[in-house]
């Protein structure tokens, strides 16, 4: 039974999702240092270019080869500019489930890229990898992330009280950790009936070696 994700590229009408590479270092560092990323994710701060190189060269490959997950750069098809990141984590190969999360660069918000990339990834997981469940967790006050989950057809399953550590600006400009709730969403193959039809017609899955 497959227990690691392949090196994959996924294309939609506007985006290409692919493995991170050295050319992404500067844009990845800039994206990860954004205040919204700091507030709602566990990405260590400050996140400099050295941290970006370690993420690309060590963390992301290790997650994939160990079977825990997959990191995909989200890039614009026409410009090849990095506009986000899709992550799979906590993968259970027996249950065929994984946890999906997404980050959108501040220069690319409001374009619908997060939902397009998340839907493309979900479609690939269900059709190509034969997964049966995708889980998403969002901080209770992270309404933008919740809107993405709802837009791609996720079903809200409930609240994990006090399970999330977010960060908030203090009066002196520093960041303080704040405990809050997680809202848990799930997506099953049947949830994409209708909602994923447009992508199913336009999406393409290729090995990264073929695409590169």
Please provide the spans of the model-predicted regions.
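A generic structural signal for short beta-strands and their flanking turns/coil linkers
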Residues: 68-70, 96
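Short loop/turn motifs at secondary-structure junctions and domain boundaries
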Residues: 62-68
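Acyl-donor (CoA/ACP) binding surface of acyl/acetyltransferases
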Residues: 1-35, 75-212
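A generic secondary-structure signal
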Residues: 58-62, 124
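Conserved GNAT-fold acetyl-CoA-binding loop/helix
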Residues: 36-58, 70-72
């Amino acid at each position: 039974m497959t227990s690691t994700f392949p090196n994959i590229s996924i294309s939609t009408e506007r985006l290409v999702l692919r493995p991170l590479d050295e050319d992404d270092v500067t844009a990845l560092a800039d994206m990860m240092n954004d205040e919204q990323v700091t507030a709602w994710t566990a990405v260590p701060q400050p996140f400099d270019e050295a941290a970006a190189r370690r993420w690309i060269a060590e963390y992301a490959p290790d997650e994939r080869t160990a079977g825990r997950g997959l990191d995909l750069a989200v890039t614009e098809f026409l410009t090849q500019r990095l506009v986000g990141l899709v992550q799979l984590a906590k993968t259970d190969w027996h249950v065929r489930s994984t946890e999906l999360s997404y980050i959108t660069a501040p220069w690319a918000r409001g374009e619908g890229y997060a939902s397009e990339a998340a839907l493309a990834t979900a479609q690939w997981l269900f059709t190509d990898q034969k997964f049966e469940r995708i889980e998403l967790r969002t901080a209770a006050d992270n309404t933008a992330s919740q809107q993405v989950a709802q837009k791609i057809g996720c079903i809200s399953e409930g609240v994990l009280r006090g399970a999330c550590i977010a960060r908030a600006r203090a009066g002196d400009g520093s960041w303080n950790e704040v405990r809050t709730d997680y809202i848990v969403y799930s997506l099953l193959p049947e949830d994409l009936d209708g909602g994923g039809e447009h992508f199913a017609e336009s999406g393409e899955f290729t090995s990264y070696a073929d695409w590169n």
